[in-house]
Amino acid sequence: MHPRHAGSLRIGLVSDTHGLLRPEASAFLAGSDHIVHAGDICDPRILDALRALAPLTAVRGNNDHGAWAERLRGSESLQLGGIMLHVLHDLAALAIDPAAAGVQVVVSGHSHQPRVSRRDGVLYVNPGSAGPRRFRLPIAAAELRIQGRDVTALVREFAA
């Protein structure tokens, strides 16, 4: 169970599952108000499993193929709790100026490296990979906490 403050939203962030949604990642995402998957899903059953936990926004990654993947967009912008998020798989493909577009949070994946940074007033979050281990990179997911106009990000690494 995740502690919740009155009036706050918890947004679960996941990426690069590559056909494997680890139980510890599912447990971490449970209780989210919304889940965002930043691509490289590789199996549509993962989307079903995430939708069973919370409303879902997902984008297509470079390894997502087939009719199910064609229904996903390469990027999505959405507003949650008054905060504008922009989601895409590979940050190198970012085609907007987030600050100029009024985006407060950019969520991406692709690198399998969890990272949280802030540039020009925009919070950038890569939740890392919640799928099969790649090289020596950690298995991870992340969350956004939205409380009014304040947004914080937390990366959670799993022992898997």
Map each language-model feature to its residues.
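Short coil/turn connectors at secondary-structure junctions
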Residues: 83, 102, 120-121
